[in-house]
């Protein structure tokens, strides 16, 4: 036991010595000091995007990007049209020949070779004269380039109209789809009045949409343009109700029902008055009745016409219907949060707009079914789809989604439309044969005194207009003939009698335009001492192969 006596006590009975507070290593133990207070690290936070980052106001950068995309779309459209190649189609040759005849009549008093106003589906003093002026300076390529310029302007107007109605993105999508349609591609390289008529309808529509916030009287600016469109192509009147409907709907949300109704009344009365005055002051009413209102019905079936309509315009129409349904369901077209606070048109208004634009695309097929003819259907489908295109643009933007969530779907849709447009346009532009060899063969046999029969008399009358007149050429679509004994013949019998008498100095048949009458003429020529076969010129077209058969009258 030591002096303290504690060493000899058992462990449980030991009394611990008091610990000194300043000795951290007492009894050979290390004591960890308490940790110092450390400030917590800041967590990662995403700052809120200021609304200024979603600015919807116009900007120079946005405008230039949009214009660049639109320019690219129009460049693609131009290339697709310019790549088409063939000699003049009979309609092109007819309008250009008529235009040259009208110019000679106006400037020199030369009698018209035919009464063009009686059977043209547009005024012969409007587009044919303009196209003939261009043709006289630049040839057929120049006349076709005029159509291309008009169709490019139409695409630009469609972009502007859609941007005004909906949004920038929808406008670019609408222009992109419209630019690659068969109708657009072909009409852009077609020297007929269709491109000019559609352009004028587009201008009238743009004026109506652009003046929606101006006083009602401003809509009268569209009146002369709309009337001129009808004068260029009488069937353009089919789309005047759509323009009137847009005059009502575009002004209603901003200027109220009274101003909107006044706009419609002003536009309807002024347009109707000008049309009535024009019909009364000119001799065009007979042409309107023969080619439009009282047109002879064909024999094409309803199912066939529906199939053709679906093939040539179904994809864009379905896209427009999808856009209309989505627009009715949700009107917002901008991703900016600011758009939620903007006043949007009501659902009833959106339903009416969707029905108006999409329903217009059905007018041409319905009218052609009524007439039971596929003639010009592909062009008229393009007229209707021009008005449905803004809704198709909305459909594409909804398909892609906000912030370009599904761009592959939009690319797939546009690529499909592009492939269809190219294939259909190539097929369309190859339907008629190349007439180069035929014109070269008959040129030495044609003069200003002879009388000629042709499946497509407009083509040689156009290419050989320096040597012959349109009045010298007889078509295979109806004929009257007085034989040498004074007997009168009409229809098929007229062809037989005229060939039997050797009335024609030259006969040119292609077997395509009217095969039934071609066979009648060929049978009448067979064994006829008045004629000998000058040549059988083979050709190839979209339907296969064929040949020009050319007979020339013998000397006796």
What are these regions (language model features)?
Residues 228, 240-243, 247-338, 346-349, ...:
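Transmembrane-lumen/periplasm boundary regions of multi-pass, lipid-linked membrane glycan transferases
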Residues 267-270, 330, 343-350, 390, ...:
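Signature aromatic-anchored transmembrane alpha helix within multi-pass, membrane-resident enzymes
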Residues 169, 204-219:
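Membrane-interface transmembrane helices that cradle and orient dolichyl/undecaprenyl
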Residues 425-436, 442-485, 500-517, 543:
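Short periplasmic/luminal acceptor-recognition loop of GT-C membrane glycosyltransferases, typified by
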Residues 89, 147, 183-196:
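Short acidic/glycine- and proline-prone juxtamembrane loop motifs at membrane-interface regions
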Residues 187-188, 194-197, 238, 371-404:
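Hydrophobic/aromatic-rich transmembrane helices and adjacent perimembrane loops
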Residues 77, 94-129:
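Extracytosolic helix-loop segments that constitute the early lumenal/periplasmic catalytic or substrate-binding loops
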Residues 1-79, 266-267:
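Start-transfer (signal-anchor) and selected internal transmembrane alpha helices
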